[in-house]
Amino acid sequence: MTHDKTCPCGSPKIYQDCCQILHLGLDSGAQLATSPEQLMRSRYCAFVLKNFDYIIKTHHAAYLDGLTLEQLQQGPHPEWLGLDVLSANDTTQPDGSKFGTVTFKAWYKMSGEIDAIYERSEFIFEQGRWFYTKGHQMHAKLPGRNDPCVCHSGKKFKQCCMKG
């Protein structure tokens, strides 16, 4: 990743000042995501960069359902186009436990077709950090020809990613 590019998570910051801090700080505990949204954005960025170790380590072990690092590495891997966070929240229960949700669309291209993962992800705060637990999939509708492009280029969809 070049130093002059904004972070894939959609932040205006460069990767080194954004998600890389979380990617590198996870094992040491030096820098952890402070909210479900920040964790979700850093996980999206990890998918873009194929940092599958981060994906596994931020996925709650009780919810992995047999998912392994090797499976993630196998592919095929899409070309990630952009991320739209639609809503995010976290709540603290009376017993002190914390839960959160993030609803997002992660746009990608695979085999020449554009699609999105449209999901309401669930998160839990345990052992001093946030973990992804599971997601509820929804159907994503492609933007109209004259709508802004999913890659956030500022161009119309028909003049950008829709072209091919």
From Swiss-Prot:
SUPFAM superfamilies: NTF2-like (SSF54427), Sec-C motif (SSF103642). InterPro entries: NTF2-like_dom_sf, SEC_C_motif, UPF0225, YchJ-like_M. Coiled coil: none annotated. It comes from the Bacteria. Belongs to the UPF0225 family. This is UPF0225 protein Shewana3_2159. It comes from Shewanella sp. (strain ANA-3).
